[in-house]
Regions:
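Bacterial N-terminal signal peptides that target proteins for export
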Residues: 1-8
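C-terminal motif of bacterial Sec signal peptides marking the signal peptidase cleavage site
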Residues: 16-18
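Non-catalytic macromolecular-recognition regions in eukaryotic signaling proteins
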Residues: 20-183
């Protein structure tokens, strides 16, 4: 009788846990809606973005965009539920202001971490920092990346105030036409 009760209890627990699903990103991480990038938080500079980046609207080079040849590699972010990339966001030294955001329809499974702001967010506002002679090259890099519930091709939106573009990005999984990320 004891074994039957234990099996029944286990079956009920499994059934109930299957209904709960994976929590929304807001339930796991302290995510802000929109954060301004601090110009002083530049981590590096480069002569030009690598071929792994796609230049969007002339204001930002995005890693792993569908127009690049390979998706970004991810690593486990929290012991099992989320995967993260570690890739710089590259902007022109002295470039124009822009907004990079996660569309609302994917905010349950995608968010931005850091990229010049610290913490987690769904939108970053880059103010168009003044050109700094402190940086040797023409492009500045903000450290950070993207975090997804599971590897997939996800959308980001880039807006420069006059135009808005939806960009598909391979995060741990390729977008159509891309190679898978490196192992």
């Amino acid at each position: 009788m004891g074994r039957a009760i234990r099996l029944l209890t286990l079956a009920i627990i499994l059934l109930l846990s299957a209904c709960t699903g994976i929590p929304h990103a807001r339930e796991v991480f302290d995510i802000e809606d929109s954060v301004a990038v601090e110009c002083s938080s530049v981590d590096d500079w480069v002569e030009e973005p690598s071929p792994a980046y796609a230049l969007i609207l002339g204001v930002v080079a995005v890693p792993g965009a569908e127009s690049t040849s390979q998706a970004m590699q991810t690593a486990n972010a929290d012991g099992g539920l989320w995967e993260s990339t570690k890739s710089g966001l590259i902007v022109p030294n002295g470039g124009k202001p822009f907004i990079l955001s996660v569309p609302q329809d994917v905010q349950d499974r995608l968010y931005i971490w850091d990229w010049g702001t610290g913490g987690f967010k769904y939108e970053i506002r880059v103010p168009g920092c003044e050109r700094s002679e402190d940086y040797v090259d023409d492009w500045v890099v903000f450290a950070g990346g993207l975090t997804v519930r599971e590897p997939e091709c996800v959308p980001l939106v880039v807006s420069d105030g006059s135009e808005e573009v939806r960009v598909m990005v391979g995060v741990g999984a390729p977008c159509p036409g891309q190679e898978p990320p490196p192992e």
